[in-house]
A protein has these predicted regions:
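Active-site and adjacent substrate-binding regions of carbohydrate-active enzymes
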Residues: 1-350
């Protein structure tokens, strides 16, 4: 039920829609589902599967209308199912009206909604590298300055040092909570605040991350959102976190912190990789179990998950052990995969 672009069947395959989810609510209720997390259904040019939002207050026509969304919330509530939306507040689409205004001129009131810098001696403002590889800077020909994008160049980062950005996001959160949603899954939430724009230590991945990963400014933002918005509603927040330790996770979701309720960590999803699913190493079950036990013992409320839009199917990925397709054709492989599927199901549902 997490991914609305699968199997709804009311649009041409493989795209689904909100009406399709509504049609499956009885089935989901029968399964015992209590929460449906919707990946982004906002208006978007879909450079990054909806994580590039061009309008936070409307529904992408492919998925339906605001009326469909209100009906989904209402019908789900009748079945004691809550709706959680994706919240993407590190960046917007470059087609969002804020960014269109921002890039139009240095003196535009929306200029400081984003992070703009001039180049240095014909070079980019710093040496940071993107989550999607390559530099984080894109030169805009209108003013000759560069804008920061930790992800795609179509996803300019918001400037959380600007109080107006906070006010805009507070208003958006209230808009959806007043409509009746039950909370938010907060996308890459621990990278939203950039303490400085200095050059970073050169790394295999994410050069510059020491200037934006889990900064104190991020904690201040989350506490302010909790104080001014979330505490006024019966709602739930879970943060997707990047490269965090259990101690760092507790700083985000510890009961006394007043920030998030829960975190999604990637640690157990790195049992066959090195801090990045593209840097593969042989899978070892003991590595997976060790990480799960560590986080279970040390983190207040860690999400128990294996799959989402970022992760391949677990049984195929971990169950084949070497990760090679030909492993699946070996004698006994089918039985081994079935046992692994049962094991992961037990871990998720008990």
């Amino acid at each position: 039920a997490e991914r609305e672009q699968v199997g709804a069947g009311l649009l041409a395959a493989p795209l689904g829609d909100l009406k399709g989810i509504i049609s499956k609510l009885d089935y989901l209720a029968d399964l015992g589902i209590g929460i449906i997390w919707l990946s982004p259904v906002y208006c978007s040019p879909n450079d990054d599967n909806g994580y590039d939002i061009s309008d936070y207050r409307n529904i992408h026509p492919d998925f339906g209308t605001l009326s469909d969304m209100k009906r989904l919330i209402s019908e789900a509530k009748k079945r004691d199912i809550k709706i959680v939306m994706d919240l993407v507040i590190n960046h917007t689409s470059d087609e969002h009206e804020w960014f269109k205004q921002s890039r139009s001129g240095i003196d535009n009131p929306y200029r400081d909604y984003y992070i703009w810098q001039s180049g240095k001696d014909g070079k980019m403002p710093n040496n940071w590298t993107s989550f999607f590889s390559g530099p984080v800077w894109e030169k805009d020909e209108t003013t000759g300055q560069y804008y920061l994008h930790l992800f795609s160049k179509k996803q300019p980062d918001l400037n959380w040092k600007n109080p107006k950005v906070m006010q805009e996001i507070q208003s958006i959160l209230k808009y959806w909570l007043d409509m009746g949603i039950a909370g938010f899954r907060c996308d890459v939430i621990n990278v939203i605040y950039k303490t400085s724009l200095k050059n970073g230590k050169k790394r295999l991945i994410l050069t510059g991350r020491e200037h934006y990963l889990s900064q104190q400014g991020c904690h201040s933002i989350l506490r302010e959102l909790r104080r001014t918005v979330f505490s006024n509603y019966d709602c739930f927040t879970v943060g997707e976190t990047v490269l965090v330790t259990p101690a760092m996770a507790n700083d985000l979701c510890g009961e006394s912190r007043g920030e998030l309720d829960m975190v999604f960590s990637f640690a157990h999803m790195d049992a066959d990789s090195i801090n990045n699913k593209w840097l593969k190493i042989p899978f070892k079950p003991e590595r997976l179990f060790s990480v799960l036990a560590k986080w279970q013992n040390e983190v207040g409320w860690n999400a128990n998950y294996f799959e989402n839009h970022d992760q391949p199917r677990t049984v195929s990925r971990y169950g084949s052990f070497t990760g090679k397709v030909d492993e699946l054709n070996k004698p006994g492989a089918k039985d081994a995969l079935e046992r692994f599927a049962k094991l992961t199901a037990c871990m998720l549902f008990t």
